[in-house]
C-alpha cells in the first residue's frame, strides 16, 4: 500500500465516550476516499484510559474497565467501510499502559514510561493486543505503537510474546514502533518484529533522503501545528504533492495527521487541500 495516508487522533475520554454513537462512519470513509488515501492510522486510545473498542482481555485483567466499554465497535465499522473502498486500516496504540490512568496502570502491572516496562506488564499488554488483533483479523493491516522510548530489559521471550500478539489474526501486518520524533529517530528500529518506520517528523525537510534501512520508508507529520488540532494547514498542496511523490519513489508511505470535528468529519478546507495535492495529473 505505498503512497499517501491519513492519521486521526480520535480520543474521547470517559466522560465523552457516549458521543461515539454520533460518529458518521460513512462520511468519514468517504472523506478518506475523496482524498485518495491508501491507508488510515486510527487511534484505539491513548493515555486517558478510554478506548473506542471493546477488549475482553482488558476487562479480565482490569474488571473496572467494563464500566467504560464503548457503545459501538467503531474500528470494526470503520475497517469494513475502508475495506469496501480499498483503504487499509492500521491501528494505533501506545506501547505502554495509559499513563494518565493510575488504576489501569496498576492492574496492568506497568510503571512510568520513563522506566523499563516490567515483564508482568509485557505479558498483560500482549494479551490486550492479541484480543484486538484477533477481533479485527485481516481488517487490521498493521499496528503503530507509540511511545517506545524505553525497551531496556525486555527479554527475547517478552518480545516474542508481544510480536506474536501483534501478528495474531493476520501474520503479514505492518508493524511500527515509535521511538521519538525527528531526523535522528523517525527511522529507528525499536522492536525485533518492526518492518515499517514509525516516521514521526514534525518539520519534514523539503526533500527526503531515505536512510539505509531494512524497514519500509515512512514519514508521518501533522497537517496543522499539532496532532489532531483544528487549525490552518502548515503546508501547501505542492509541498504535500512533492512528499507523497518522494515516498512513492521510495516504495514507502507518507501519512498526514488530520483533525476531525465532533462527528468524525474532516474539515472541508483540509479535504480540498489534500484533494488538490493527490489529484492525478492529466
Tell what function each PLM region has.
Residues 1-282:
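Mature catalytic domains of secreted/periplasmic carbohydrate-active enzymes
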Amino acid at each position: 500500500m505505498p503512497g499517501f495516508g491519513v492519521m486521526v487522533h480520535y480520543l474521547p475520554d470517559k466522560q465523552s465516550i457516549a458521543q461515539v454513537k454520533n460518529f458518521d462512519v460513512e462520511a468519514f470513509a468517504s472523506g478518506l476516499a475523496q482524498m485518495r488515501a491508501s491507508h488510515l492510522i486510527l487511534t484505539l486510545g491513548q493515555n486517558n484510559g478510554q478506548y473506542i473498542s471493546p477488549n475482553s482481555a482488558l476487562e479480565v485483567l482490569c474488571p473496572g474497565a467494563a464500566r467504560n466499554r464503548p457503545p459501538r465497535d467503531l474500528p470494526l465499522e470503520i475497517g469494513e467501510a475502508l475495506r469496501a473502498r480499498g483503504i487499509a486500516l492500521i491501528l494505533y496504540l501506545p506501547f505502554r499502559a495509559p499513563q494518565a490512568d493510575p488504576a489501569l496502570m496498576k492492574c496492568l502491572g506497568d510503571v512510568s514510561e520513563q522506566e523499563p516496562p516490567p515483564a508482568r506488564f509485557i505479558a498483560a499488554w500482549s494479551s490486550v493486543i492479541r484480543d484486538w488483533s484477533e477481533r479485527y483479523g485481516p481488517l487490521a493491516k498493521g499496528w503503530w505503537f507509540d511511545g517506545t522510548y524505553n525497551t531496556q530489559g525486555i527479554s527475547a521471550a517478552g518480545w516474542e510474546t508481544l510480536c506474536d500478539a501483534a501478528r495474531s489474526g493476520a501474520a503479514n501486518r505492518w508493524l511500527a514502533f515509535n521511538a521519538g520524533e525527528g531526523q535522528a529517530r523517525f527511522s529507528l528500529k525499536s522492536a525485533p518484529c518492526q518492518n515499517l518506520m514509525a516516521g514521526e517528523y514534525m518539520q519534514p525537510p523539503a526533500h527526503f533522503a531515505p536512510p539505509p534501512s531494512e524497514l519500509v520508508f515512512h514519514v508521518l507529520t501533522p497537517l496543522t501545528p499539532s496532532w489532531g488540532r483544528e487549525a490552518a494547514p502548515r503546508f501547501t498542496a505542492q509541498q504535500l504533492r512533492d512528499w507523497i511523490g518522494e515516498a512513492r519513489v521510495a516504495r514507502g508511505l507518507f501519512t498526514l495527521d488530520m483533525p476531525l470535528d465532533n462527528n468524525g468529519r474532516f474539515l472541508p478546507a483540509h479535504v480540498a487541500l489534500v484533494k488538490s495535492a493527490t489529484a492525478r495529473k492529466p
